Amino acid sequence: SAANALQLPFADNTFDKVMCSEVLEHIPDYQGALKEIERVLKPGGLFCASVPRHWPEKICWFFSEAYHQVEGGHLRIFKAGELKQQIETLGFHAFHQHWAHALHSPFWWLKCIFWKTQNSNWVIKQYHRFLVWDLMDKPVFTRTLEKILNPIMGKSVVLYFRKEAN
């Protein structure tokens, strides 16, 4: 079953850790969702949020209007610094940030360039097979390549916070 991100079915200060991965860009009232996360997280608890990184996402929006107009799709593009500030105003302290999924950026750019034929496009299908292979087998070469490319073109930014103790 699904929960409403603006009314989580949990008591205040329930969790030691909360993770919100690739969700906030889909929620109309993402600030309300962040307030709910703050509410259910214990003082001193850890919060991890990941969202699509600004510039790789901008490229997707540039190549395809349909990409961000699908039902339940991305409603906004976050800038990491601005999102971090918004979360800190809720009583969190940011302590780490990194980028992830660099090998996924070209896949999404291709999908956006060839939006109307993405399901039948040979190049996109092969790239998808490559990503699945990479995720399942975790070869040293692609893991190393992604570590090198993540700071440059990681598809996602991952932010880590600690909720202030009372």
Predicted regions located by residue number:
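Secondary-structure boundary/capping signal
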Residues: 31, 45, 67, 91-95
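A SAM-dependent methyltransferase catalytic signature shared across enzymes that methylate proteins
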Residues: 81-98, 135, 162-163
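Short, flexible active-site loop motifs that bind/organize anionic cofactors or intermediates
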Residues: 5, 23, 73, 93-96
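A C-terminal cap/extension of S-adenosyl-L-methionine-dependent methyltransferases
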Residues: 62, 99-166
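A conserved catalytic-core signature of glycosyltransferases
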Residues: 5, 72-73, 78, 154-156
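Acceptor-substrate binding/catalytic loop of class I
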Residues: 65-82, 99-101
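Conserved SAM-binding loop
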Residues: 1-60, 80-84, 159-163
